[in-house]
């Protein structure tokens, strides 16, 4: 199938969702050669990935992931397996790759939102092109990444937050590692991670590195069963809602997807230059995260509050972003968000 798919994609013909599922099954089962994988994902990138193609690839990756069971259900290809009355599960995983050298905003947000009573299954990885991925900063904060799936499940159930370390849960991705590394360009695999949460997160705030991906990935999430959420991109390239200017937002609701622009001023927040939002290496970013969770003021706190506000709206904990920002600020200042970090560190290290 992959040889036929390469020939079609080279001619700029789109694949159906079913065809993409067949191709990705071949890739992730080890049935495609490295040359075929590299050719296919390069041709797909040059053509431009469609909503159906991304959806099909995400379904296969979800189906082959090691599941993290939260409650009684896990998100997979078959939507009938899902208990729609279960507790909301949030993921704040983004694509990364923004090149803006920002600190770990979505990881900081995860602790705040979980302290507000939302179950958070934070999916993430080590840095690929940046200085510090979510796994890197969590490790620097003292979180033990080398834990079994049952420890992650217990973490989410008992304290309301767990970290889903992508390499440990997506073993089938090993077949694409070599081709991806050797061609050295962004491909469909750079956007699949946030679409394939092994705990079946049904609520997401997903930051993307390109504006043209905002509405597209929102449509994909909708097809995959996301009940509510936001896909976002800052005008400065940040894969977050930024403080430097406008951000593009695609809102996912029961009625569909709505695209619009927002600015910090809409929520009473002062703009900040990108330099004030910069991070560093894992140890430096760990200091930033602790400072924010300890109540330190400044631009870094404001951008975390803004993004947390959207996450709290997505999960139904706030009726609008302004209320979400207020709730996030109160949660930090009460010490509850820092307590979540301390509890995650303790639980994951007790498991050793």
From Swiss-Prot:
Anthranilate 2 binds at residue 180. GO terms for biological process: L-tryptophan biosynthetic process. Anthranilate 1 binds at residues 94, 125. GO terms for molecular function: anthranilate phosphoribosyltransferase activity; magnesium ion binding. It catalyses: N-(5-phospho-beta-D-ribosyl)anthranilate + diphosphate = 5-phospho-alpha-D-ribose 1-diphosphate + anthranilate. It is an enzyme of class 2 (transferase). 5-phospho-alpha-D-ribose 1-diphosphate binds at residues 94, 97-98, 102, 104-107, 122-130, 134. One of its GO terms (cellular component) is cytosol. It comes from the Bacteria. Its cofactor is Mg(2+). Pathway: Amino-acid biosynthesis; L-tryptophan biosynthesis; L-tryptophan from chorismate: step 2/5. Gene3D superfamilies: Nucleoside phosphorylase/phosphoribosyltransferase catalytic domain (3.40.1030.10), Transferase, Pyrimidine Nucleoside Phosphorylase, Chain C (1.20.970.10). The keyword Transcription regulation does not apply. Mg(2+) 1 binds at residues 106, 240. Catalyzes the transfer of the phosphoribosyl group of 5-phosphorylribose-1-pyrophosphate (PRPP) to anthranilate to yield N-(5'-phosphoribosyl)-anthranilate (PRA). Belongs to the anthranilate phosphoribosyltransferase family. NCBIfam families: trpD. Homodimer. This is Anthranilate phosphoribosyltransferase. It comes from Citrifermentans bemidjiense (strain ATCC BAA-1014 / DSM 16622 / JCM 12645 / Bem). The gene is trpD.
